[in-house]
Amino acid sequence: DSIRNSIDNYGADIQKLITSKINTNDTWARDHAFITLLKEDATPLLLDFCFNGWGMKFAANYDNQINNELYFHHPVLKGEYVFCRNFILEGGSIESDGKGSLLTTEQCLLAKNRNEMNRQEVEDFLKETFNLKQVLWLKHGYLAGDDTDSHVDTLARFCPDDTIVYVKCTNEKDEHYKELAMMEEELKAFRTLNGRPYRLLPLPMASAVYDEEHHRLPATYANFLIMNEAVLYPTYADFVNDMRAKEVLAEAFPGREIVGIDCTALIKQHGSLHCVTMQYPEGVY
């Protein structure tokens, strides 16, 4: 009731809210939730991968069962269940343009604490599972304080019209400068399925945010959420960079409303807006 009252106070439509009481380990739905594909007849396919707490760094015994609970015991999701639990995969570790290209990082998907497979084996699995034509691998790029082994949703994201937005560090004294500069060069070398370079739009590096023990946190503007008519993006009480990020996203998503969401509380848990959400296409609810 307290959740419903809080949401109602913000003017949201309570009739569109579905609640289920399920045990969880953490808050990061992006990494354990179903990944959805659509069949040619628009039937949703709900792909259920194994989640192991980002390489067994944290407990995941409850989170790893949430999909099962939502589909079989709290039947609020519709579509065809697809068993993929023989492969460890987090939603934040992959980025698809919906046209046959997928962007990911070697540091995460080739980590020995995920799957005991080499790069070609992982790529073949991804292509078959997601009906892909190419997988674009990033070897460089990281954020201090990141527990995920460099999830791509913190570094670089696909946008409409063969555009990629990515985190760029301009401060040569910042610890991220070299790695993000090398990532930028990799992005410049990538090609679309038509053989053309991607249109690249740099997002500002968020000003450093620290926890109580003065450890740097992985604040990033790449962790935005795409919706039908809007893009929600994280802000960090940093007016100049928050506004610059909004300008870049407005250029990348013409016609969509760009809405900032204060993520100063979320980032203290080492994640942000995209990490804590998972979108589903029409027909799943």
Segments from the language model and where they lie:
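The feature marks the mature, well-folded catalytic cores of soluble enzymes
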Residues: 1-285
